[in-house]
Amino acid sequence: TAGILFDYGIFTNLSPDHIGPAEHASFEEYMECKSLLFRQCKIGVVNADDEHVDGILKGHTCEVKTFSAEREADLMASDIGFINEDGKLGMHFNVTGCMDCQAKVHIPGRFSVYNSMVTMLVCHLAGISDEAILEGLSKVQVKGRVEMLPVSKDYTLIIDYAHNEVSTRSVLTTLMEYHPKRLICVYGGGGNRSKLRRYDMGEVTGEMADLCVLTCDNPRDEEIRDINNDIKVGLARSNGKYIEIDDRKEAIAYCMKNAKPGDMIVLLGKGHEDYQEIKGVKYHFDEREAVAEILDEMKAGKR
């Protein structure tokens, strides 16, 4: 991107990542590379609440606009609350500063408030009306990222791409803030991948979920049960409760048929993907389609 002058540069947060022999030598070098954006943009829009914001802005040449839920900023959020109604989750909050309004977003989690604020601020700076911003925000969804499917007013069904310990802990922590009656996880593990990741996935889901339904993900060249046996090592560490249903659609159907009011069912690992990779072949499989088919079958009395 050298030589390109951006209209806006955005900073939301920074954590140690992409550090290693083939990437960045240190966190400091990683942050320095990120900070270059604010020397080649006209306006920098930054999260004033992130502990690394000063490092990111070191040497900046742009005009700076800030957003925050904790301190004075160009755009501020307050009175943050959770939406949990008719099987739909989200956040609502008040906005002051360069905008003055009430906002809501149907993506659960506190991080959604920050993502909403930066979106609102950039759109406001670009001259978009407050009404259009709020309408767009109320309708936004991100495919495969805490994506809710409208299945029932009694329970919530969510698709998320989380497929390692860090991302899984993050999404489950977010959902636990909504106080589900039961948190049920449906997932497997990727074949030809680290066993350590499987142990960790089993341990964190066993710790945080009320029930884990082990099933097929992308087994690739491995057997589903071999992969899930590794996951069970982690489940044993956290004394997690589980069942095994190899067919992913059948695993989802089991959870939907046995859901109780207030339950949250989380389909982990596939997210935006629309296939399963088995023995070198990619078979079409979209969880959204599978859920719709199961609903139709349940209505027709076939399940």
What are the residue ranges of the model-derived segments?
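Flexible active-site lid/hinge loop adjacent to a nucleotide/diphosphate
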Residues: 1-59, 193
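Short glycine/proline-enriched loop/turn "hinge" motifs that connect secondary-structure elements
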Residues: 1-5, 85, 204
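Short, acidic/turn-prone active-site loops that include or flank metal/cofactor-
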Residues: 13-17, 69-72, 218, 290
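Glycine/Thr-rich phosphate-binding loops of Rossmann-like dinucleotide-binding domains
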Residues: 19-20, 54-55, 74, 222, ...
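Adenine nucleotide phosphate-binding catalytic loops in nucleotide-utilizing enzymes
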Residues: 21-31, 35, 42-43, 58-169
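Short, polar loop motifs at secondary-structure junctions
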Residues: 48-52, 69-70, 272
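ATP-dependent carboxylate-amine ligase
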Residues: 61, 98, 121-131, 135, ...
